[in-house]
A protein has these predicted regions:
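Structural signal for interior beta-strand "rungs" in well-ordered beta-sheet cores
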Residues: 43, 102-312
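Terminal amphipathic alpha-helical/low-complexity segments used for targeting or macromolecular assembly
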Residues: 1-106, 171, 177-178, 182-196, ...
Length: 350
């Protein structure tokens, strides 16, 4: 989709970047570097794609400072972080326009709920005593439970749920179907079955948290406690945060990953797809957990772990390499056994 053309020089100025080429060149859309045409702005953040500078038809490319232009190639905008700059430009060129404040006639808003300056769309429900900050956007089918608190400029997409008594900070985004504050998985085994443990705590999402579609952050079990997701954390689709868990600042959880109840993740922890942290574990700051790994033990700051159970990533790589050699090792071992047996038999007949 094309938009009003903008000079490359203006974009570079807003990004704090330097232009190599024509600052007057106009861009009117964004595209990938491999299929970009005239008028396109694209980006190059991975140096493996540098050869594409010689073939792309893009008008301008966001690049790292060390990237050199090619003859007859596109104009370059040198910035510190091309990927982040690309995200900013994408938001400028294709803004998501929020509707004006108001309550749709088919929405249900409790008389004592506070929704001043909020747009509440059709079939949304806002419970008694709930407070939603100005500039927030509540899409169709959203349920905000009684006594919930939501900060300013939040965006709750279709069919998201904020359960009673839960709290969302400013600029929180819940994608479609996300649930904050559902009951945690708590059952006491008995002779006759499983006795449900009432979940009477809450769930709290700090400022600038985004939760993907159909992800769940369960409420904690005990009154006065809360499951917490720290500022700026980003949760992908189909992510599970168990009751009473605590996530620090800037945590990233990729699709299908999960944190079991009462575990603590430090700041800037990354869980790759399908990674899991068992309950009552403490994970230090900056830890990265590889895809499909299971963390059984506490991890120190900065650890890089992979596997089941998760171990040091480099150790796991060596083990994985050794595992692929097992068929050859077994064949060599069988051959060695035959040779030893033959030698023993020859000795016995001497």
């Amino acid at each position: 989709m094309r938009v009003a053309p903008r000079p490359v020089g203006d974009i570079a100025q807003e990004l704090g970047g330097d232009v190599v080429g024509s600052a007057q060149a106009l861009v009117d859309h964004i595209a990938g570097i491999e299929n970009a045409g005239a008028g396109a702005l694209t980006f190059l953040s991975n140096r493996r794609y540098v050869p594409h500078l010689a073939t792309t038809q893009a008008t301008a490319v966001l690049v790292h400072p060390g990237i050199e232009p090619v003859p007859n190639g596109p104009t370059l905008i040198r910035v510190t972080d091309p990927y982040a700059a690309f995200a900013r430009v994408l938001a400028w060129m294709y803004p998501r326009h929020r509707p004006s404040a108001g309550v749709h006639p088919r929405a249900v808003v409790a008389d004592d709920a506070v929704v001043d300056g909020v747009f509440v769309d059709a079939l949304a429900v806002v419970g008694a005593g709930a407070i939603i900050g100005a500039g927030s956007w509540i899409e169709p089918g959203v349920v905000v439970g009684a006594g919930a608190r939501i900060g300013v400029d939040a965006h709750l997409m279709a069919n998201a749920v904020v359960a009673p008594g839960c709290t969302l900070g400013d600029r929180v985004v819940l994608n479609p179907g996300a649930v904050v504050g559902g009951d945690g998985f708590g059952f006491a085994p008995t002779a006759t079955g499983h006795e449900k443990i009432p979940q009477r705590g809450s769930a709290t999402l700090a400022d600038d948290v985004e939760v993907g579609s159909n992800s769940c952050i369960d409420r904690s079990a005990l009154p006065g406690t809360t499951t917490t997701v720290g500022p700026g954390s980003k949760l992908d689709n189909l992510v599970q945060v168990g009751h009473g868990a605590t996530l620090g600042r800037g945590v990233r959880m990729v699709a299908y990953s999960g944190v079991a109840g009462s575990s603590t993740l430090g700041d800037h922890v990354t869980l790759a797809a399908k990674a899991a942290v068992l309950g009552h574990r403490t994970i230090g700051d900056g830890v990265a957990v590889g895809a499909a790994s299971v963390v059984h033990d506490a991890q120190p700051d900065g650890a890089r772990v992979t596997g089941i159970p998760a171990i040091n990533h480099r150790t796991w790589l060596r083990a994985a390499t050794a595992f692929s050699e097992l068929p050859n090792v077994l064949r060599a071992l069988r051959d060695l056994r035959r040779r030893v047996k033959a030698l023993e038999e020859a000795r016995d007949h001497e």
